[in-house]
A protein has these predicted regions:
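A charged N-terminal "starter" segment
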Residues: 1-111, 144-148, 152-153, 184, ...
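Active-site beta-loop-alpha junctions enriched in small/polar residues
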Residues: 30-36, 52-55, 71-73, 92-96, ...
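A short acidic-Thr-Gly-centered motif at the start of a beta-strand
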Residues: 37-43, 222-223, 309-310
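Residue-level marker for buried hydrophobic side chains located in beta-strands
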Residues: 49-50, 113, 190, 230
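Solvent-exposed alpha-helices and their adjacent loops that cap or buttress functional pockets
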Residues: 83, 106-107, 124, 191, ...
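Active-site loop/helix belt of alpha/beta enzymes
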Residues: 121-251
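Charged (often Lys/Glu-rich) extended helix/loop segments that serve as interaction or gating elements
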Residues: 228-343
Length: 343
């Protein structure tokens, strides 16, 4: 191993970002998706950064551009966050909210606050995913109360649906049914999360034009009726298309190709979601191959079936749209892949 790496296009990062800015949206990049690209966004755009863990703050220099998303915090963590200058927060339960409010009673400062709300998920995977956020009746109760709090400057709501969301974008109708008029009149910001689909072998992004139409519909309605700003929180949409994973063929036997990387240090998304990465140069007709990672795990498979034209040992296998949730594990002491920026 050692030759495999991620190759990230700076221009593609900025191009994906601009697609969202052209819709008239504020953007907060979801850092957990691929933190290494934060520097490009921070230096070249006005992006904010949605961060969930204290240690991830190292990827951003300007703390005024951070939205810190709380989970089970305490006074000690809040002290550290305030010392760093963070003043934008998202909370998803009343316990964490109460911790923040008590802390603010002793601070002579103002914060911007979003309450995370849960939306109904239409999925067959019941019990697989934790559901973040408060119920709409909690949001309807809390927002008017918080509007009176002198420690809160901008106030708003946050939600986030599943990754690769191709169908559930009827935001305006859902929000207008779930939230009372008084609630919407008392907010300044509304973060609609991410979930914009990206093209893989087993998924499509062809519905993006319709999705963008529904987002703009919501944004314009929210601004006209309630003078509130819409924020979108992309991760995969920016990171994936910007990144290719370059590997080398170590061996070929029968119809199996072994490469010098693993899903465990290059594409955990393959196991978790699961997605199937596109392969540069794959063809419609030809011999079928399995592309397997270098570990002894039988699940270490990038693609079960891909048609390639005369692959040879030493050739490159390049995976496309490979920049989302490509974090490494310590399985078999695998090294973390290098990240190379181009253009």
């Amino acid at each position: 191993m050692g030759k495999s790496k991620f190759i990230v296009s700076k221009s593609k990062i900025l191009g994906q970002f601009q697609k969202l800015k052209q819709l008239g949206l504020e953007v907060s990049y979801s850092v957990k998706t691929f933190p290494e690209i934060c520097q490009i966004l921070e230096e070249n755009t006005d992006s904010f950064f949605s961060i969930h863990m204290f240690q991830t703050l190292n990827f951003v220099k300007d703390m005024s551009r951070v939205w810190f998303i709380a989970q089970a915090w305490d006074k000690e963590l809040l002290d550290k966050l305030f010392e760093k200058g963070i003043r934008n927060f998202v909370v998803d339960n009343e316990v964490d909210l109460e911790t923040l409010l008590k802390y603010l009673e002793k601070k002579n400062t103002k914060v911007n606050l979003l309450l995370r709300m849960r939306l109904k998920e239409h999925t067959i995977y019941t019990g697989k995913y934790f559901v973040f956020g408060m119920y709409s009746h909690q949001i309807n109760k809390l927002i008017p109360e918080l509007r009176k709090n002198k420690s809160i400057n901008k106030l708003g709501i946050h939600f986030h649906r599943k990754t690769q969301n191709t169908s559930e974008w009827n935001i305006k109708d859902e929000i207008s049914e779930m939230l009372e008029k008084e609630t919407l009149e008392n907010i300044d910001l509304f973060n609609i999360g991410g979930g914009l689909p990206v093209e893989y072998k087993n998924t499509t992004d062809r519905n993006l034009p319709h999705i963008f139409e529904k987002i703009v519909e919501f944004k314009e309605w929210l601004k006209k009726e309630y003078d509130a700003t819409t924020i979108i929180e992309p991760g995969r949409f920016i990171a994936a298309p910007s990144t290719r994973m370059e590997t080398e063929i170590l061996a070929i036997h029968d119809s199996n190709i072994i490469v010098d990387a693993s899903v465990y240090n290059g594409d955990t998304d393959t196991i978790l979601v699961p997605i199937k990465l596109l392969v540069e140069g794959e063809v419609d007709q030809g011999n079928d191959y399995v592309i397997k990672g270098c570990t002894p795990c039988s699940m270490d498979i990038f693609r079960y079936q891909v048609k390639l034209k005369n692959p040879k040992v030493g050739d490159r296998i390049v995976f496309l749209n490979a920049g989302a949730y490509c974090f490494a594990t310590d399985f078999c002491n695998l090294p973390k892949l290098d990240v190379e920026f181009v253009d």
